[in-house]
């Protein structure tokens, strides 16, 4: 079975109960299945908390965090440091052989600066699969933060959904975007089981899909088109359904290519 990229986000990273549920499901799945799994994560809530403590402003444009040069070290520490090693510690606690990485390790993704206006914010494209294949073949669980490195050697903050898309493209893997939302909702607040690009754009135009969810949906659409396969947006809150998700069943909203 092809690898599955699991993108983790939302408040899961700061929620012990949720982490326990997620890693319990992961542990149970790994004991009975051989499908290679890769975790890609952000950690916006941790960054927001740290910025507040440091009394630094949080500015977002089109769902992306503006990252000035004097803040990239702080954000790198939060994502590639605290968030990544927290997930690694949870993997270790549950007997999973985790390896903490960022997008720059082994050139997993090629990262370029988006614009001067956004600062150290990067766009990720597929990189080299060699390191991940080496780790997966040896039975490791890669845990990848969304911090990248440009060809000029600059640290870049990459949207975690987009980072996960690039890793999925690198491996030719399936992708699920796992967060604190159960999927995409229609205008009546009902969850959609699946959605096409045309329908998604209509919901954006109507103001039903907004802010960070636009970035999430666009990342899923881009991945679905590139991978030529559906991509799912789902919630980690339904721990009892996670094993089904890992097996390819729909528990959220499936984005059609």
Curated annotation (Swiss-Prot):
Substrate binds at residues 43-44, 65, 157. Pathway: Amino-acid biosynthesis; L-arginine biosynthesis; N(2)-acetyl-L-ornithine from L-glutamate: step 2/4. It comes from the Bacteria. Keywords: Amino-acid biosynthesis, Arginine biosynthesis, ATP-binding, Cytoplasm, Kinase, Nucleotide-binding, Transferase. ATP binds at residues 180-185, 208-210. It is found in: Cytoplasm. Its EC number is 2.7.2.8. One of its GO terms (biological process) is arginine biosynthetic process via ornithine. Disulfide bonds: none annotated. The record marks 7, 216 as: Transition state stabilizer. Its main location: cytoplasm. One of its GO terms (cellular component) is cytoplasm. It is an enzyme of class 2 (transferase). It catalyses: N-acetyl-L-glutamate + ATP = N-acetyl-L-glutamyl 5-phosphate + ADP. Belongs to the acetylglutamate kinase family. ArgB subfamily. Homodimer. Catalyzes the ATP-dependent phosphorylation of N-acetyl-L-glutamate. NCBIfam families: argB (TIGR00761). This is Acetylglutamate kinase. The gene is argB.
């Amino acid at each position: 079975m092809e690898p599955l990229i699991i993108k983790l986000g939302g408040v899961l990273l700061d929620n012990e109960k949720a982490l326990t549920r997620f890693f319990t499901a992961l542990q149970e799945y790994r004991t009975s299945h051989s499908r290679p799994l890769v975790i890609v994560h952000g950690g916006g809530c941790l960054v927001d908390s740290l910025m507040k403590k440091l009394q630094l402003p949080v500015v977002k444009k089109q769902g992306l965090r503006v990252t000035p040069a004097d803040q990239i070290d702080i954000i790198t520490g939060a994502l590639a440091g605290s968030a990544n090693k927290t997930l690694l510690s949870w993997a270790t606690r549950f007997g999973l052989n985790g390896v903490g990485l960022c997008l720059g390790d082994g050139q997993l993704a090629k990262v370029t600066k988006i614009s001067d206006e956004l600062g150290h914010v990067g766009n990720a494209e597929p990189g080299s699969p060699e390191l991940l294949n080496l780790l997966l073949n040896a039975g490791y669980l890669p845990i990848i933060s969304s911090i990248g490195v440009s060809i000029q050697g600059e640290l870049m903050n990459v949207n975690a959904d987009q980072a996960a898309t690039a890793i999925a493209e690198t491996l030719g893997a399936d992708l699920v975007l796992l967060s604190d939302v159960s999927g995409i909702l229609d205008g009546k607040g009902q969850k959609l089981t699946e959605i096409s690009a045309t329908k998604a754009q209509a919901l954006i135009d109507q103001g039903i899909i907004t802010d960070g969810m636009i970035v999430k949906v666009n990342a899923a659409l881009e991945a679905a088109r590139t991978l030529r396969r559906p991509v799912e947006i789902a919630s980690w809150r339904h721990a009892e359904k996670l094993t089904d998700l890992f097996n390819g069943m729909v528990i959220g909203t499936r984005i059609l290519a």
